Amino acid sequence: MNSLAGLFITAVFVENLALTFFLGMCTFLAISKKIEVAFGMGIAVIVVQTLTVPINNLVYQYLLRDGALVWAGLAEIDLTFLGLVSYLGVIAAIVQILEMFLDRFMPALHSALGIYLPLIAVNCAILGGSLFMVERDYNFTESLVYGLGSGFGWALAIVALAGVRERLKYSDVPDGLQGLGITFISAGLMAMGFMAFSGIRL
């Protein structure tokens, strides 16, 4: 239990996908103008990440890894070369289901997220979560916790950046830094702040 809690905290703070590995930057910078929209995007990423990482774990364990098909009498077959395509297929399917759900039950949020909702399907932070899961050889429970933690960490980062950007609207930002200029600086300073967690091992 302690190891799972440590894995969650590590995924949120120590190995934050946005501020440590700089994954998902396109969406991270584009959607972080308003806290409400950033929060909605963060929830969407949490849901997608929490679902896709453990599902991709099952795909890897029972279909792709070397010897995974022993249950089908095909122990000598190694399908790991299909990993990237398989993970992207799972992610795209989950995102499509989420988009249909939001369009049906939360049209305002669906409209606010716009083109960036389908772009979650090719968000490198989402794919990165599955690739890290395979690289670190997590089991199903660890994959579930890691997916939740990494999604929560990304959501925390985008909501925090949105809060900073909303405050910056009332600040006297030099003309040359307005817009993405000051946003890059703010994100960089946040990333430096998260470096304080880099030495923690849980």
From Swiss-Prot:
A Gene Ontology cellular-component term: plasma membrane
tRNA processing is among the record's keywords: no
Chief localisation class: membrane
Entry membrane topology: Multi-pass membrane protein
Cellular localisation: Cell inner membrane
Transmembrane parts of this sequence: 4-24, 35-55, 81-101, 114-134, 144-164, 180-200
GO molecular function, one term: oxidoreductase activity, acting on NAD(P)H, quinone or similar compound as acceptor
Keyword flag Membrane: yes
Reaction equation(s) it catalyzes: a ubiquinone + n Na(+)(in) + NADH + H(+) = a ubiquinol + n Na(+)(out) + NAD(+)
Keywords: Cell inner membrane, Cell membrane, Ion transport, Membrane, NAD, Sodium, Sodium transport, Translocase, Transmembrane, Transmembrane helix, Transport, Ubiquinone
Segments forming a coiled coil: none
Record-level GO BP terms: respiratory electron transport chain; sodium ion transport
Documented EC number(s): 7.2.1.1
Subunit structure: Composed of six subunits; NqrA, NqrB, NqrC, NqrD, NqrE and NqrF.
UniProt record similarity statement: Belongs to the NqrDE/RnfAE family.
Role: NQR complex catalyzes the reduction of ubiquinone-1 to ubiquinol by two successive reactions, coupled with the transport of Na(+) ions from the cytoplasm to the periplasm. NqrA to NqrE are probably involved in the second step, the conversion of ubisemiquinone to ubiquinol.
The protein, known as: Na(+)-translocating NADH-quinone reductase subunit E
Organism: Nitrosomonas europaea (strain ATCC 19718 / CIP 103999 / KCTC 2705 / NBRC 14298)
The encoding gene: nqrE
